[in-house]
Amino acid sequence: MAKPSYVKFEVPAELAEKALEAVELARDTGRIRKGTNETTKAVERGQAKLVIIAEDVDPEEIVAHLPPLCEEKEIPYIYVPSKKELGAAAGIEVPAASVAIIEPGKGRELVEEIAMKVRELMK
């Protein structure tokens, strides 16, 4: 299956797993924003430290604006394969198309590591 048009780079599976782990840590010890509307606001306000976008969002237009917006605001973003997994990591019982980490809490070092690796992938 072809990747959606908004997926700008390939994310290794282990890095996607780390992103989900960072969401869980931030959920428990920091602050996150769940869903595309809250994520978009966090990016526009410059509050997001890392944005996580699901690759299986349909229709694509729901999240297609996030990668260019993150690039404009210089906020790192990463893709994970499943909105269902992303929703579970965010602590909600429904799928989440995107999540923004506002305060990483105990996941700070993990978020910084992911952000560094994402910058390398985007080159």
Curated annotation (Swiss-Prot):
Example GO BP: translation
Protein localization: Cytoplasm
GO cellular component: cytoplasm; ribonucleoprotein complex; ribosome
InterPro entries recorded: eL8/uL1-like, Ribosomal_eL30-like_sf, Ribosomal_eL8-like_CS, Ribosomal_eL8/eL30/eS12/Gad45, Ribosomal_eL8/Nhp2, Ribosomal_eL8_arc
Similarity remark: Belongs to the eukaryotic ribosomal protein eL8 family.
Physiological role: Multifunctional RNA-binding protein that recognizes the K-turn motif in ribosomal RNA, the RNA component of RNase P, box H/ACA, box C/D and box C'/D' sRNAs.
Subunit and partners: Part of the 50S ribosomal subunit. Probably part of the RNase P complex.
Record's protein name: Large ribosomal subunit protein eL8
